[in-house]
Each structure stands twice: as structure tokens, then as C-alpha cells.
Amino acid sequence: MLTGVPAAQRQAIKGHPPGVVWLTGLSGAGKSTLAAALETSLIRRGAHTMLLDGDSLRSGLNSDLGFSTHDRAQNVLRAAQVCNLMVDAGLLVIVAMISPLAQARELARSQLRHTAFLEVYINAPLAVCELRDPKGLYKRV
């Protein structure tokens, strides 16, 4: 990306290297809650962060997407592209989104290959996710 400030200079200004922590898991697993707690902890340590939540992206940037395999992959790819912009700005980016397709997550990782990328699967039991069910996705009819 074309920028007037070299990456090393941004890192010196921010006091840390940029990177991405990508939280994935079932709906109701606690991704958004954990992402918010992680961001709070990092900010307390002086880090410059940005939290990208899948629900926020779905209601804004990705509001034109449905839930087909193609659209789910596009949802993840667009999030990765936003991450690239944030990483170029020297931020630690925390992404919290279901991102169910392994191939799409791998594409996201490849889009961010020039930065530290940590994928974390939040392994909450299905029964817990069903109890929480913030979006009504597990509701039985």
C-alpha cells in the first residue's frame, strides 16, 4: 500500500507491531464478549487497537450479502481487506465473526500474510450456544 509513513516508523510511533487476532466459532460462543475483553486489556497496556465485529460488518459494509457459500466467503474476504487497511495504519485488529468456511478463513490469512495473524476458535459447547442464542438461530420450530 502506498503510504507516506514507513511501517517501521508507524511501529515506533505505536510502540508495537501491527497484527490480527481472528476469533471464530459458533453463534453464541462468546466471540464478541472475548474480543471486547481482549481489546480492553490491550488498550490498558497502551496498544492501538480496532475491533471488527461480524454483526456490525453485516449491518454495514456487508449488508448486501446473504448467507450463501459465496456470500459467506465474501463476508470474510471484505473483513480481511478492512484488516489490511488497519494493519497498514499500525493497529492491532481483533476480528470477531463466525466465519464458518475454512477456505474463506485461509483466504483471509493469505490476504494478511505480511502481518502476524492469529486465528482462535472459541470452542463453546453447542448446548451453551443454544442456551445463549442471541440471534434466535438455534430456535426450534
Name every feature range the model reports, one short phrase each.
Residues A7-R10, A80-Q81, R105-L107:
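A generic local structural motif
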